[in-house]
Amino acid sequence: MHISEKGLVLIKRYEGLRLKAYQCRAGRWTLGYGHTHNLNIGDVITQEQAEAFLREDIAQVTALLNTQIKVPLTQNQYDAICSLVFNIGMTAFTTSTLLKKLNVGDYSGASAEFMKWSKAKVNGKRTPLPGLIKRRQAEKALFESA
């Protein structure tokens, strides 16, 4: 499967576009639409470069999902999971209870797991972040609208 335009819009809405590298609330250097690889303080890009980074980052996410998910998904379910994985990272997803529940066909149980990913480390402590709570609510609603 591939992410749809609706899925890309969801990711862009919650990641936001930043053309200059900044440190996110969790302390990671970020640029464009949530791109975090090979960045240096002070890096600046164009919107076109941000779009290219997003396509590259999404390609990695979809490649992972297409090998790890063993059950059929609707496009909305796939898009919701793409957004989640884009945000939490591939390693976190592959070891998640959400994936385990999904792969045994427990779609309801998988949906319930989204909200467990609404915290980030801030000053060394796992803290609920309002932006993550809203994002997880949107992803969960999209997943359930299958």
UniProtKB/Swiss-Prot annotation:
The keyword Coiled coil does not apply. Its EC number is 3.2.1.17. GO terms for biological process: cell wall macromolecule catabolic process; defense response to bacterium; peptidoglycan catabolic process; viral release from host cell by cytolysis. Its main location: host cell. Coiled coil: none annotated. It is an enzyme of class 3 (hydrolase). One of its GO terms (cellular component) is host cell cytoplasm. It catalyses: Hydrolysis of (1->4)-beta-linkages between N-acetylmuramic acid and N-acetyl-D-glucosamine residues in a peptidoglycan and between N-acetyl-D-glucosamine residues in chitodextrins. It is found in: Host cytoplasm. The keyword Transcription does not apply. One of its GO terms (molecular function) is lysozyme activity. The active site is at E15, C24. Keywords: Antimicrobial, Bacteriolytic enzyme, Cytolysis, Glycosidase, Host cell lysis by virus, Host cytoplasm, Hydrolase, Viral release from host cell. SUPFAM superfamilies: Lysozyme-like. Disulfide bonds: none annotated. PANTHER family: LYSOZYME RRRD-RELATED, PTHR38107. Endolysin with lysozyme activity that degrades host peptidoglycans and participates with the holin and spanin proteins in the sequential events which lead to the programmed host cell lysis releasing the mature viral particles. Once the holin has permeabilized the host cell membrane, the endolysin can reach the periplasm and break down the peptidoglycan layer. Belongs to the glycosyl hydrolase 24 family. This is Endolysin. It comes from Acyrthosiphon pisum secondary endosymbiont phage 1 (Bacteriophage APSE-1).
